Amino acid sequence: MSTAALVEGKIVQCIGAVIDVEFPRESMPKIYDALILEGSELTLEVQQQLGDGVVRTICLGASDGLRRGVVVKNTGNPISVPVGKPTLGRIMDVLGRPIDEAGPIESENKRSIHQKAPAFDELSPSTELLETGIKVIDLICPFAKGGKVGLFGGAGVGKTVNMMELINNIAKEHGGYSVFAGVGERTREGNDFYHEMKDSNVLDKVALVYGQMNEPPGNRLRVALTGLTMAEHFRDEGLDVLFFVDNIYRFTLAGTEVSALLGRMPSAVGYQPTLAEEMGKLQERITSTKKGSITSVQAVYVPADDLTDPSPATTFGHLDATVVLSRDIASLGIYPAVDPLDSTSRQIDPNVIGEEHYSITRRVQQTLQRYKELRDIIAILGMDELSPEDKLSVARARKIQRFLSQPFHVAEVFTGSPGKYVPLKETIRGFKMIVDGECDHLPEQAFYMVGTIDEAFEKAKKIQ
């Protein structure tokens, strides 16, 4: 604590989550200083200096019962949270306080949630692939170790289930540490995730930070930074860490709420004028350095399925791979509902993934694109009017479409079918056989919800 720790101020105005505090003019708190209420655990974070000793703060917690004249103390430092191994296996809130009723977190290390992004010469780009065991992702939009991935989708198309499956497949195989930041999502999902980790015996390798949708906007805005600070610490210790965020859109939305409360003019669609800067500050810190790596998977809600909305559009530019979930594909009953024509990855390069993988990916996309173009003709004139080549393309595309589906481990409870982990070699072999015409004699139902291509052959025997 600095010498300013003794400085006291008084609340002069309360408007929802925004609190104005008056300090002596010669000792005003700095921007991002943490203020604490006397006799309470409530923390305020300084956002603006209004002049005449008055600062405007955002409340990290419920502001019920606050009134003018209440004494506030300046800690003289930004919000700091515990980092390191003591955080593993624990659930924490935005201030790093435990909320799992398992006693205090005995961490000697504390770190400010506001850190500078690593300098350009410290960064370390990676081309090593990270196998996920999910066919459509490994084939169409492969992940890089130490890269950033976004799961884009509207309401109810399966972002959280996809993320849970990725955590299930990567975190368990990975063996390193993971940090999960629940930003403005359902408390039920946070609870389910905790028990999922506990049941699979990987809880001692995961730090969980929650600021759920029932919490004030200040908590939801800062909880992503809290989780990121913990992940950065592991990275700076020379470790490879996984960082999961569900959901980045809620971070933006909390920023919008705070911005409006602070009296800033809204910009496009009512978002905060500082949207790009806030997103950039967060995303530039999620990066891999020469010391260690952060591999990040972020769910991004797409309002009204509009990918051009400022929030998802701002996120796109920061990512190495984008997995776009489509309502049209979900309506066909194909899960994961990943759109193979909309999803992209910087790893799709023959020099990175190899010539065979690259050519199979492109042939699969060409076949699906041809089917998309022919759909209108089929709807009006029927299949009989197509040329033999086009009929073959359509048949193969429908098989590819169904083969891109896969039963998930985390959805076993709902589907009743056991989850499948498909190695990358098997994925490439399966799709190669389909585009090469080796499966033309099989019915398309045989490809639905199977793992490897061998399972499709077995299923075909049962059907026939």
Curated annotation (Swiss-Prot):
GO terms for cellular component: plasma membrane; proton-transporting ATP synthase complex. InterPro entries: AAA+_ATPase, ATP-synt_VA_C, ATP_synth_F1_bsu, ATPase_a/bsu_AS, ATPase_alpha/beta_chains, ATPase_F1/V1/A1_a/bsu_N, ATPase_F1/V1/A1_a/bsu_N_sf, ATPase_F1/V1/A1_a/bsu_nucl-bd. PROSITE patterns: ATPASE_ALPHA_BETA (PS00152). Its EC number is 7.1.2.2. The keyword Translocase applies. GO terms for molecular function: ATP binding; ATP hydrolysis activity; proton-transporting ATP synthase activity, rotational mechanism. SMART domains: AAA. Keywords: ATP synthesis, ATP-binding, Cell inner membrane, Cell membrane, CF(1), Hydrogen ion transport, Ion transport, Membrane, Nucleotide-binding, Translocase, Transport. Its main location: membrane. ATP binds at G153, G154, A155, G156, V157, G158, K159, T160. It catalyses: ATP + H2O + 4 H(+)(in) = ADP + phosphate + 5 H(+)(out). It is a peripheral membrane protein. The keyword Nucleus does not apply. It is found in: Cell inner membrane. It is an enzyme of class 7 (translocase). Produces ATP from ADP in the presence of a proton gradient across the membrane. The catalytic sites are hosted primarily by the beta subunits. F-type ATPases have 2 components, CF(1) - the catalytic core - and CF(0) - the membrane proton channel. CF(1) has five subunits: alpha(3), beta(3), gamma(1), delta(1), epsilon(1). CF(0) has three main subunits: a(1), b(2) and c(9-12). The alpha and beta chains form an alternating ring which encloses part of the gamma chain. CF(1) is attached to CF(0) by a central stalk formed by the gamma and epsilon chains, while a peripheral stalk is formed by the delta and b chains. HAMAP family: ATP_synth_beta_bact. Belongs to the ATPase alpha/beta chains family. This is ATP synthase subunit beta 1. It comes from Burkholderia thailandensis (strain ATCC 700388 / DSM 13276 / CCUG 48851 / CIP 106301 / E264).
